[in-house]
């Protein structure tokens, strides 16, 4: 949840120190909104399994409801006097990354996007016999229509950074493999003459948020 990056010297503080107005939220099933029955060991491997399965049974995927939570956060920011509505950005990390991608695609008020530790693609999950914590990102039959690289492609020309994409086990994916899987997105940005607006990169070990995202924070 948000508490992991909200401590002294964390990502949130670094953003604030660079002059950004930050709204950090725990979407449903994460952090402060996590179910009390989700024990640490179970949660580590299966994530918000109970919430995800309940959501699927009602025909409302958890990832979609989380995207809605993020859009409501954009509503809050847009209504504040100290926020320039033309400069709203979204940063989704780990389990918050996929719903942030959906939210940004559906809400053009989000002008640029950074996704750190996001599952590289749904297709990668199909190819792996073992995966960890993917239930909360599941959409039934999604690959009949699209995959995550297709969503990034549809974000063009808005700037998108993909940092430390992960495989279905949560391990860092090789940058070369990520580049291959996101060829469709790179083509979309290239056709829009904004090739530089899509960046796929690792986060150096020990690198601070400010060091990693200096260009992204300045990008307008």
List the model feature ranges, each with a label.
Residues 89-100:
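Gly/Ala-rich beta-loop-alpha elbow adjacent to hydrolase catalytic centers
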Residues 27-30, 95-96, 119-120, 166-169, ...:
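Short, glycine-/Ser/Thr-/acidic-enriched flexible segments
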Residues 76, 102-106:
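Active-site signature of alpha/beta-hydrolase-fold catalytic machinery across serine-
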Residues 1-80, 85, 93, 120-132:
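Cap/lid segment of the alpha/beta-hydrolase catalytic domain
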Residues 135, 168, 183-220:
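C-terminal catalytic histidine-bearing segment of alpha/beta-hydrolase fold enzymes
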Residues 18-21, 85-87, 108-112, 157-159:
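Loop/turn elements at helix/coil->beta-strand transitions in domains of secreted/extracellular proteins
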Residues 49-60, 65, 110-159, 169-174, ...:
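Mobile cap/lid helix-loop segments that gate and shape the active-site cleft of serine hydrolases
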Residues 26, 91, 116-117, 163:
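Alpha/beta-hydrolase-fold catalytic nucleophile elbow
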């Amino acid at each position: 949840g948000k508490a992991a990056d909200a401590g002294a010297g964390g990502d949130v503080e670094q953003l604030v120190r660079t002059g950004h107005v930050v709204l950090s939220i725990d979407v449903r099933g994460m952090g402060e909104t996590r179910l009390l029955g989700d024990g640490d060991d179970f949660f580590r491997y299966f994530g918000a399994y109970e919430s995800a399965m309940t959501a699927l049974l009602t025909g409302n995927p958890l990832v979609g409801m989380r995207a809605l939570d993020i859009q409501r956060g954009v509503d809050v920011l847009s209504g504040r006097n100290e926020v320039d509505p033309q400069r709203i950005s979204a940063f989704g990390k780990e389990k918050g990354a996929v719903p942030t991608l959906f939210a940004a695609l559906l809400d053009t008020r989000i002008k640029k996007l950074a996704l750190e530790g996001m599952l590289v693609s749904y297709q990668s999950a199909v190819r792996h016999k073992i995966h960890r914590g993917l239930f909360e990102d599941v959409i039934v039959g999604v690959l009949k229509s699209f995959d995550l690289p297709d969503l990034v492609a549809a974000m063009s020309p808005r700037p998108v950074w993909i940092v430390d994409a992960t495989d279905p086990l949560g391990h860092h994916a090789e940058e070369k493999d990520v580049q291959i899987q996101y060829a469709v997105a790179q083509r979309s940005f290239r056709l829009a003459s904004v090739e530089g607006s899509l960046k796929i990169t690792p986060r150096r070990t020990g690198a601070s948020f400010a060091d990693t995202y200096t260009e992204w924070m300045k990008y307008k």
